[in-house]
Amino acid sequence: MARVTVEDCVDKVPNRFELVMLASHRAREIAAGDPLTIDRDNDKNPVVSLREIADETQSADDLRERLIESHQTQIEVDEPEEDAMALLQGVEQDRPAQDDMSEEQMLRALMEAQGQK
């Protein structure tokens, strides 16, 4: 049964290695609980996935996209603008308040803090 199914699928996916990748991914989806698009007929998940590809109830392009997405580890996220990013990170809160202390006043305050005068 499976050999006939593979030969039927080669028309839809000419590369046998890619066919194996797509069928195994679909078999994992079925095992995870995705609904079947054809009758099971006492076949196991890999055979069902090959039959789905052969009957074109699962398109190779859609399976390929889902396979690629399942292997992606980094999700692309739109980054906010640089100005908004600084506000979101609280950079404005980290800056000292505006002060009118001169250099001379600062030196005197430091000397007093150290106990010198």
Curated annotation (Swiss-Prot):
SMART domains reported in the protein's UniProt record: RNA_pol_Rpb6
Key word Cytoplasm present: no
Taxonomy, superkingdom: Bacteria
An annotated GO BP: DNA-templated transcription
Keyword Mitochondrion: no
This protein's UniProt keywords: DNA-directed RNA polymerase, Nucleotidyltransferase, Transcription, Transferase
Catalysed reactions, as listed in the record: RNA(n) + a ribonucleoside 5'-triphosphate = RNA(n+1) + diphosphate
E.C. designation(s): 2.7.7.6
GO MF, one annotated term: DNA binding
Name of the top EC class for this enzyme: transferase
UniProt-listed InterPro entries: DNA-dir_RNA_pol_omega, Pol_omega/Rpo6/RPB6, RPB6/omega-like_sf
GO cellular component: DNA-directed RNA polymerase complex
Pfam families xrefs: RNA_pol_Rpb6
Subunit structure: The RNAP catalytic core consists of 2 alpha, 1 beta, 1 beta' and 1 omega subunit. When a sigma factor is associated with the core the holoenzyme is formed, which can initiate transcription.
Family to which the UniProt record says this protein belongs: Belongs to the RNA polymerase subunit omega family.
Known role: Promotes RNA polymerase assembly. Latches the N- and C-terminal regions of the beta' subunit thereby facilitating its interaction with the beta and alpha subunits.
Name listed for the protein in its UniProt record: DNA-directed RNA polymerase subunit omega
Organism per entry: Jannaschia sp. (strain CCS1)
